[in-house]
């Protein structure tokens, strides 16, 4: 795959006055995850996923209903301060406003994940995506920040650390709610219970800062192509410019408009496995805008490190509902997803659904 510097540089997309052919998507079969009958238009219907107040006494039921219906929901009164959300959005804007040459100094390596670059799913699509991003998956981001902000890196590293700490607590809280809606608890997940008792982390988090520049022909471009997240769940903060869309068979593409202080939660592949298929991992994408750029910050809460085997929760299986998926480690699943992309779930499936 050519390096970022050899192609139209993603760091300069916002300055282009015409849409390059390599970034021009067709209006039909725009991505491989859509059924042919549904892949005829980029238009989204006027509907949206529910906004759930986490202080509501019925929060577990509400989250469960939304998760089963949409594989996604929005949350308010989640405990994350507006200042922290503003700080990480400002950090992202400062980073993406830098000259392209400067950003490329913090580019991710060929074998690494952390750093600046195009979406990880790019190799699976013929056309390029109208976006740039910065991934924080380990402590190497501190070196990148030192390169980008020689005098202010300590301040920006502090923002990231606070965001990770707060999102980790929120993700754990949401996990309890979603499990509760299925009638199970973390104690019913043997490996998760052991990790909690030992003081270890149930999941590993990463952050993806995304920037979708203004686009001369947004109706023919794609900011981020349709996909599911590999995670247990993903928590997304989006700036005040819309672009996120989720897909549901009964509804088609549905735009998730941003609202102040509201976060979006997407169910990922790992939770779909844990739930034995009862809760879907949501297919989603990002569209772009002709007049306004968009920033989003995704907290990707994945599986645990090491050789922990992840499989459907035993209480959710039985003679009438056999396990749909074989056990797998987080690392192994990521490798399969990297190789076969949207066919990863099929690759670990052991039986067909009974209905």
UniProtKB/Swiss-Prot annotation:
Free-text tissue specificity from the UniProt record: Expressed in siliques and in seeds, specifically at the rim of the embryo and the outer integument. Also expressed in flowers. Not detected in roots, stems and leaves.
Residues at the active site: 294
UniProt-listed InterPro entries: DIOX_N, IPNS-like_FE2OG_OXY, IPNS-like_sf, Iron_ascorbate_oxido_reductase, Oxoglu/Fe-dep_dioxygenase_dom
Gene3D superfamilies noted in UniProt: B-lactam Antibiotic, Isopenicillin N Synthase, Chain
Iron among keywords: yes
SUPFAM superfamilies, alphabetized: Clavaminate synthase-like
Record pathway: Plant hormone biosynthesis; gibberellin biosynthesis
PANTHER family xref list: 2-OXOGLUTARATE (2OG) AND FE(II)-DEPENDENT OXYGENASE SUPERFAMILY PROTEIN-RELATED (PTHR47990)
This protein's name: Gibberellin 3-beta-dioxygenase 4
Originating organism: Arabidopsis thaliana (Mouse-ear cress)
